[in-house]
């Protein structure tokens, strides 16, 4: 690691600690040339798979796009920013756990729908209406009926 003070190439680590809830390593270093001390942080690189769109094109995974979709579906809903961040992280974790280099946008949509179903049913229907391209009120009605059936099945298994 180059020294930020004298740009010498050699430094020694004098202390290492976990930081950022175990996601980073904080290292205290000392320059061998000038003796100045400085801190560095080391973290892993998270590589998300590429997204294969329905038209066959592929593009890099875009966290900002996912966040906008969630925020739009959750607009004016009683959901905290912390809950949104947790859902966002959970969705990305599930996508990474697929273990694929390329993931179809349809699969990502299904993962998002599962997360929204668990978080807020209104947001789930909002997202589904865009994602599944509802054309009329009947499509909304069918989606809500499916959601209610799913809820009843979950309640039966919980008892």
Curated annotation (Swiss-Prot):
It comes from the Bacteria. InterPro entries: ATP-cone_dom, NrdR-like_N, RNR_NrdR-like. Binds 1 zinc ion. Residues 49-139 form the ATP-cone domain. Its cofactor is Zn(2+). Keywords: ATP-binding, DNA-binding, Metal-binding, Nucleotide-binding, Repressor, Transcription, Transcription regulation, Zinc, Zinc-finger. One of its GO terms (molecular function) is ATP binding. A zinc finger (unnamed) spans 3-34. GO terms for biological process: negative regulation of DNA-templated transcription. HAMAP family: NrdR (MF_00440). Negatively regulates transcription of bacterial ribonucleotide reductase nrd genes and operons by binding to NrdR-boxes. Belongs to the NrdR family. This is Transcriptional repressor NrdR. It comes from Acinetobacter baylyi (strain ATCC 33305 / BD413 / ADP1).
